[in-house]
């Protein structure tokens, strides 16, 4: 499940937690959404609390890369350097598509994060959310 935006997280925090603990296997969100969900001021505090939940948590961090938490292990991935960002539309969606493509092909989490970062870097170099 994707957290969508911080306002949605704020309105439905209790429901998100119930889903996360009982029904979901995978949660994806950006740093702000995760901090809002966990009601923490910084990502490290949020991640430390999320490590105890036995789910795959994926956190995008814009130019600061991405993070995955699984089985009490935190995996970091640097972002792909983009000289000029043109439009952020579609960056999260392309990250997720790259991540899940590799995940479904049974690649390790680091490779999944890298592919997500590569695709999101491609889309932010142009206007719009289509690669072609």
What are these regions (language model features)?
Residues 1-47, 64-65:
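Conserved beta-alpha-beta core of the PfkB/ribokinase-like small-molecule kinase fold
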Residues 14, 40-132:
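Conserved phosphate-binding/catalytic region of the ribokinase-like
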């Amino acid at each position: 499940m994707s957290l969508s935006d911080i306002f949605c997280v704020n309105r439905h925090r209790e429901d998100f937690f119930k889903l996360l603990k009982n029904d979901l296997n995978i949660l994806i969100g950006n740093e702000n959404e995760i901090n809002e969900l966990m009601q923490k001021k910084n990502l490290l505090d949020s991640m430390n609390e999320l490590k105890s939940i036995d789910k795959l948590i994926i956190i995008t961090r814009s130019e600061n890369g991405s993070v995955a938490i699984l089985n009490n292990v935190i995996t970091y991935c640097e972002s792909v350097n983009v000289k000029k960002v043109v439009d952020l539309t579609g960056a999260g969606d392309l990250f997720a598509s790259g991540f899940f493509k590799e995940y479904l092909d049974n690649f390790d989490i680091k490779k999944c994060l890298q592919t997500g970062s590569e695709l999101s870097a491609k889309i932010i170099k142009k206007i719009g959310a289509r690669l072609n």
